[in-house]
């Protein structure tokens, strides 16, 4: 049982053997999140190709009032298997420019030919 605000790491009883060049990503189930406030703390959880242990999922109950019970066999997460490319990083003195530059969080979509909605009413 996950009490409100509690987190716990749950064993799935499953293990996989991914081939080199692939990774698996453990993600929340949308129904658990929408209906019960259950999510995965480190979403997505990454499973590397070399890992051979039991898949475990750290769940968090974000509901402020209701506990959530988990039984053996419950579907608590989804697994996405995806090909991955190993990047090789090269140190450089500077980076080429881009339309976004160094603008950070919340800046995507601004200054790209969109009209300003500042002062507009809905």
Regions found by a protein language model. Give the residues of each.
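Helix-rich terminal scaffold detector
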Residues: 75, 85-122
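Compact, glycine-rich, soluble single-domain proteins
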Residues: 1-85
């Amino acid at each position: 049982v996950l009490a409100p605000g509690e987190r716990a790491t749950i064993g799935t009883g499953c293990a996989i053997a991914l081939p080199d060049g692939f990774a698996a990503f453990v993600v929340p189930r949308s129904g658990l999140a929408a209906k019960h406030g259950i999510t995965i703390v480190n979403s997505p959880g990454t499973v590397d190709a070399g890992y051979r242990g039991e898949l475990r999922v750290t769940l968090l109950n974000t509901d402020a009032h209701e506990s959530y019970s988990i039984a053996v066999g419950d579907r608590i997460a989804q697994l996405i298997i995806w090909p991955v490319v190993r990047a090789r990083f090269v140190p450089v003195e500077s980076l080429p420019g881009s339309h976004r530059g160094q603008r950070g969080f919340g800046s995507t979509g601004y200054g790209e030919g969109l009209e300003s909605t500042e002062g507009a009413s809905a």
